[in-house]
């Protein structure tokens, strides 16, 4: 059975072995550790922290001896002064070793893969990619998160399916991987506790955008899974953390480099997030669209991203000779129904009534909609003029849906799972004035004037001829010698 390993009891086998030679869990930070004020001063003044310094700081965070002000000061010093690759690698490793580790059967060593996204609007890739990879022979122990702010959370989307349970123990995760080949679960407090503390502190100290801290947060949570390979979807654009491709590339290179230094093969895909991914935004609506993609249909941009990311993972983990061959295998899993079959198994294994799981995975789009939460009202917006759709801005659309109850402003806030929006047009399509271009699903009264204006301003029209919408995929950053 899968087990949680406490610090000091050993580490998962390679390639998930990131403990370092002679290291078992989080070691004593130093025979004579520096005091926290001295560490903060060093980094504030642009100094380089040693391994003992970083491990001492992480140990103080976990054992409670670091005060909140000291944690915030260190985070700001790192944000302003940065960290080199070795410092970032040590921080990542120390965070990962601050809690318990997942351990899997030796036979699974090369099968374990996962994906992470920096967050976007309409991003339902994980719902499709995990079962597609399982259908290709992988094991996918996906530990995911909830939405906060304008981006949606994978766990929230799955919880729009009645009965789906995201709380699973390590032992239950192994059963799920045996039965379905994949699982999508929430973060356990036993795993990477130091990251949980630092993440909360970053959120209130304006240090969320620090590259070393982002890298350590992402990779520490993946290292404990004992993966063979990881792909990270680094988004850029108007609704992403990074406004442009250059900044996203900097994070991508850091993720790949730190992963390589810790024995984890990481690829990072740079993808555009100016418009929503696919045509649907909102929890239940995105589940419907994910099912459509697993029918072998659905929006081309969603399918393209699923096959691109999946192809990279199959290549990195040795399940395909090239990225293109891997992408073709993922596409075949979408077209032949095997990905949908794995999704049905995952639903049933994670608490969904088997009859409901079967109905969702075998029903028509109209039948599926009857089985998932639905908003009480629908409201369509009309094109204000003739023109070609240049862009549908994702950020204002997401912010209005957030106001309507599709998002949360604080942890634990309830969601309206049926609230969302459907794009009725594609980028590059010619529109006539008065044609419906957006359908809003709402529980409350009609859209307010400011909400309607914000949505209409999200639609960008031009006079140019119709054109084929570009793929959101821009670039793939690979590990050395790959």
Swiss-Prot record:
Any one GO biological process: cell differentiation
Residue sites binding substrate per the record: 116, 202, 217, 221
Cross-referenced SMART domains: PYNP_C (SM00941)
Residue windows of the R-A-L-X-X-A-L-V-L repeats: 393-401, 453-461
Entry's disease: Mitochondrial DNA depletion syndrome 1, MNGIE type: A multisystem disease associated with mitochondrial dysfunction. It is clinically characterized by onset between the second and fifth decades of life, ptosis, progressive external ophthalmoplegia, gastrointestinal dysmotility (often pseudoobstruction), diffuse leukoencephalopathy, cachexia, peripheral neuropathy, and myopathy.
Role: May have a role in maintaining the integrity of the blood vessels. Has growth promoting activity on endothelial cells, angiogenic activity in vivo and chemotactic activity on endothelial cells in vitro.
Protein name stated in the entry: Thymidine phosphorylase
